[in-house]
Amino acid sequence: MKFEVRGAFKTLEGWQKFTKVVEANNERYALEKVYSLIGSNHKVKRNLIKIEEVKQA
């Protein structure tokens, strides 16, 4: 299934909003994937990533 995850992460300039569509078996795995992607691409720790909404795409 595909999930659309919306949220924001903290940068030096402030909060940067994002929307990601990920392939996952359930909502929990979709969240883990987004935390992993944002963390690896932007070098942001999980406690600086705020998830606003997760919905099935």
Swiss-Prot record:
SUPFAM superfamilies: RplX-like. GO terms for cellular component: ribonucleoprotein complex; ribosome. The keyword Ribosomal protein applies. Pfam families: Ribosomal_L18A (PF01775). Gene3D superfamilies: 3.10.20.10. The keyword RNA-binding applies. Part of the 50S ribosomal subunit. Binds 23S rRNA. Belongs to the eukaryotic ribosomal protein eL20 family. This is Large ribosomal subunit protein eL20. The lineage of its organism: Archaea, Methanobacteriati, Methanobacteriota, Archaeoglobi, Archaeoglobales. The gene is rpl18a.
